Curated annotation (Swiss-Prot):
Belongs to the pyridoxamine 5'-phosphate oxidase family. SUPFAM superfamilies: FMN-binding split barrel. Its cofactor is FMN. This is Pyridoxine/pyridoxamine 5'-phosphate oxidase. Disulfide bonds: none annotated. FMN binds at residues 67-72, 82-83, 88-89, 111, 146-147, 191, 201. NCBIfam families: pdxH, PRK05679.1. It comes from Escherichia coli O157:H7.
Amino acid sequence: MSDNDELQQIAHLRREYTKGGLRRRDLPADPLTLFERWLSQACEAKLADPTAMVVATVDEHGQPYQRIVLLKHYDEKGMVFYTNLGSRKAHQIENNPRVSLLFPWHTLERQVMVIGKAERLSTLEVMKYFHSRPRDSQIGSWVSKQSSRISARGILESKFLELKQKFQQGEVPLPSFWGGFRVSLEQIEFWQGGEHRLHDRFLYQRENDAWKIDRLAP
């Protein structure tokens, strides 16, 4: 098959979205109520990694970057994830804290996008979560200088075994370079696939202490 034939095949890949619609009259006043309902349904549907979300940041040149992290907590203050503070994403957030999140629940023909500002979590919040993780995950946090170049996986594996021996007694200490961010909730868009590409999109925008809801064209 030529490259052109393959491209033509990709261009014709499509399907109808038939899982159901989303109507304005069914929307709660608070977007977190709908988010919680959708997240619960994603878990009940046994989606792989239902808390996985794409975090989009930009560097100092305006170049966007995306990666998948796991949502670890959410409330009216925002959505929380944890990371290595030496990572590319952490440096980009330090330079420009405006980010977007995306939950791609394809099987349910849904996605949720969040736009807001990322702020560092307190040491107390980070420490509480860090010590709730499996011990090997805690040790793993010490191993990698995230986003740095390495010559082989064996370097990481050797370092892990070395640190596992070092920390075999007592608690694993919290690395100074490990932390988390809370993304504020300024805008939340809910997308539900619809027949004939007439998808349902609703945008919640915070206005003072209330939420404004608008339907967007698909």
